């Protein structure tokens, strides 16, 4: 919401900004919880700052590929001209067939106008980063445990990509749901228990 972008806005620079925040707050180590596009940043943080990371929790998240792609989308997200309150509100009836989300989700996205820079940053920088810089995401080198959630009917983040990526995570617990979509609706209690068990096991 109109906060400054750190440097060129790459996941590495965003992770660096989170370290500065933790330093300011006097927090040494954290569990990282990331959803959707935020997965790239959390994974980057865990790789770059293992000494600051207790564990990684990925929730219907973007996932690293298993091999360097020959081509990838340079821009993965809504075009900039649609990133405003009016356009998104008009499109909200299409949220269910396109994204698997209720049209009422629009109210939690408002104000879209103030989020535009972040949406465009995700689409142009964050979302393509694990493909664009495949060699920099040495997932096999992660030194922390990982908990991954995903629903098979997620229309925004590929469940198949998650299944393929699992073998790259050295210490991984995977929780799969038949339904729930990108927001994992209806599985709140199961997710809460899995997260609590994960934290208690590794604390």
Model-inferred region functions:
Residues 28-68:
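Conserved hydrolase catalytic core segment
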């Amino acid at each position: 919401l109109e906060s400054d972008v750190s440097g060129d806005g790459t996941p590495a620079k965003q992770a660096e900004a989170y370290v500065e925040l933790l330093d300011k707050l006097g927090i040494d180590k954290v569990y990282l919880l990331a959803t959707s596009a935020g997965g790239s940043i959390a994974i980057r943080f865990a790789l770059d700052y293992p000494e600051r990371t207790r564990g990684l929790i990925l929730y219907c998240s973007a996932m690293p590929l298993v091999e360097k792609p020959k081509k990838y989308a340079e821009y993965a997200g809504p075009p900039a001209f649609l990133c405003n309150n009016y356009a998104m509100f008009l499109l909200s009836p299409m949220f269910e067939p396109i994204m698997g989300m209720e049209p009422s989700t629009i109210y939690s996205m408002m104000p879209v106008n103030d989020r535009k820079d972040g949406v465009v940053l995700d689409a142009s920088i964050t979302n393509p980063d694990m493909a664009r810089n495949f060699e920099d995401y040495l997932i096999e080198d992660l030194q922390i445990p990982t908990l991954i959630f995903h629903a098979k009917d997620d229309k925004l983040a590929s469940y198949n990509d998650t299944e393929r990526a699992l073998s790259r995570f050295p210490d991984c617990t995977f929780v799969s749901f038949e339904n729930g979509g990108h927001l994992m609706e209806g599985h709140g209690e199961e997710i809460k228990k899995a997260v609590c068990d994960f934290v208690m096991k590794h604390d």
